[in-house]
Design a protein with these regions (language model features):
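TPR alpha-solenoid repeat register
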Residues: 87, 132, 180-181, 185, ...
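Canonical positions in the second alpha-helix
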Residues: 75, 122, 171, 208-209, ...
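Canonical tetratricopeptide repeat
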Residues: 90, 184-191, 222-225, 256, ...
């Protein structure tokens, strides 16, 4: 009889524990609801320019959110409720609010990352639950992505390029939760990586983009720049050639190819391309200047003084104030006189 009684007591105890954790989840929901009410009131007061009262309402919202966070943290760490999608649904709502409003940032500095993780867990734990709430959850995912974009822009403007890159990668990975590929986010990350000389990261990002089927002139350009910076010259040339095959008229790729071949002292392979660009861009003297530099270089297999002078004269026709063209012409005549 004692064993039966003990079993009944244990079952009752376990039931009470389970109810307690469910209660914490309900508490979190209610505290968050109260916080949202305070936020809405604060926003209305701000429209009326009643900033002091708005600040008080936001402080009340912060208190409610702090309680909501404490309650949902308990539910998220309990063996029974942590395996339920609803727990992580509430968790994501609360933490997204903390991440979105600067007034609540000190409640958790990693709130945005935790929101993304919670949204990911919803799908992992219960795909049917996600489908039932797909509209709402997709909105949260979009909000997280937007937050990452905003954080990335702020980090970039402040010169923290590594953080900016991470933010845009996080934006991409957040959209991937629902099977979407935000390749524009990775493109921004790749561009910043090239600018910041984070060349291995740039190569990794461009590889992902190409694997995703996202082929643009910029992807090939960034890949080539990063490979060249690491002295992977064969890879640099390979990606430039692939890019030119797919986008033969893209001037940025053409210019990158010209720079690459000049760097490798393979100007004979690119001279026709440079001349074509010079004839095409009749108001831009830079291509004739490059031609003049190549033809005027005694170490080049294309060394030709008359062609060099002709090209520099073309530069002066287009831009009479180009001092370097005059200097180089003078240098050629000095060399000839010696």
């Amino acid at each position: 009889m004692k064993k039966v009684t003990f079993l009944v007591v244990m079952l009752a105890f376990l039931a009470n524990v389970s109810m307690a954790q469910n209660k914490e989840r309900v508490n979190a929901f209610n505290y968050n609801k109260n916080a949202q009410s305070y936020i809405q009131t604060a926003e209305q007061l701000m429209v009326q320019n009643r900033t002091d009262k708005a600040a008080k309402e936001m402080n009340n919202a912060k208190i409610m959110l702090q309680r909501a966070k404490a309650a949902i943290d308990l539910a998220a760490n309990h063996e029974e409720t942590k395996v339920e999608a609803k727990t992580w649904h509430y968790y994501s709502v609360i933490y997204l609010k903390i991440a979105t409003y600067p007034e609540f940032a000190e409640l958790d500095t990693e709130a945005l990352e935790k929101t993304a993780d919670a949204l990911r867990k919803i799908i992992e734990l219960d795909e049917s639950y996600f489908k039932q709430n797909a509209g709402e959850i997709s909105t949260y995912i979009q909000s997280v992505t937007t937050n990452y974009f905003n954080q990335g822009a702020v980090a970039y403007e402040s010169g923290d390029y590594v953080k900016a890159i991470d933010c845009y990668i996080n934006a991409y990975e957040t959209m991937a939760i629902v099977g979407q590929k935000d390749n524009e986010a990775l493109m921004v990350a790749a561009q910043i990586a090239v600018m910041a000389n984070e060349n291995n990261k740039a190569i990794e990002l461009c590889t992902t983009l190409l694997n995703d089927g996202f082929e643009t002139p910029q992807v090939y350009q960034y890949m080539a720049i990063a490979q060249g910076a690491l002295e992977n010259n064969d890879a640099m040339v390979e990606y430039l050639q692939k890019g030119r095959e797919k986008f033969p008229e893209d001037e940025a790729l053409i210019n990158e190819q010209i720079n690459a071949y000049l760097k490798l002292k393979r100007e004979a392979e690119i001279i026709d391309q440079i001349r074509e660009m010079a004839e095409k861009n009749t108001t831009n003297s830079v291509y004739y200047f490059i031609l003049g530099t190549i033809y005027g270089n005694p170490e080049s297999e294309l060394y030709n003084v008359d062609e060099a002078l002709n090209c520099y004269n073309k530069v002066i026709e287009i831009n009479p104030n180009d001092e370097n063209a005059y200097i180089n012409i003078a240098g050629i005549y000095i060399d000839k006189s010696n």
